[in-house]
Amino acid sequence: MKAIVVLLILALILCLYAMTTVEGACQFWSCNSSCISRGYRQGYCWGIQYKYCQCQ
């Protein structure tokens, strides 16, 4: 029973996360932290409707 509850909670979290990311658009905080974790100085969003993440 606990496993089912945990799976339902994870599914809800993933669903909410998908709703906050607008059609794959770049999210600054996610892009920036991803770039920093890979050893870059910062990350920024660019392109039409800021769709792409660029590390520098």
From Swiss-Prot:
Induction: By septic injury.
Disulfide bonds: 26-45, 31-53, 35-55
PROSITE patterns: INVERT_DEFENSINS
GO CC, alphabetical: extracellular region
Biological process according to GO: defense response to bacterium; innate immune response
Signal sequence residues: 1-24
UniProtKB keywords: Antibiotic, Antimicrobial, Defensin, Disulfide bond, Immunity, Innate immunity, Secreted, Signal
Location(s) in or outside the cell: Secreted
Primary residence: secreted
Role according to the record: Antibacterial protein involved in the immune response to septic injury. When combined with 14.026 kDa and 14.059 kDa hemolymph antimicrobial peptides, it has a strong cooperative activity against the Gram-positive bacteria B.subtilis and S.aureus, and against the Gram-negative bacteria E.coli DH5-alpha and K.pneumoniae ATCC 138833. Does not show detectable antibacterial activity when present alone. Has no hemolytic activity in human erythrocytes.
Family to which this protein belongs: Belongs to the invertebrate defensin family.
Name the record gives this protein: Defensin-1
Phylogenetic classification of the source organism: Eukaryota, Metazoa, Ecdysozoa, Arthropoda, Chelicerata
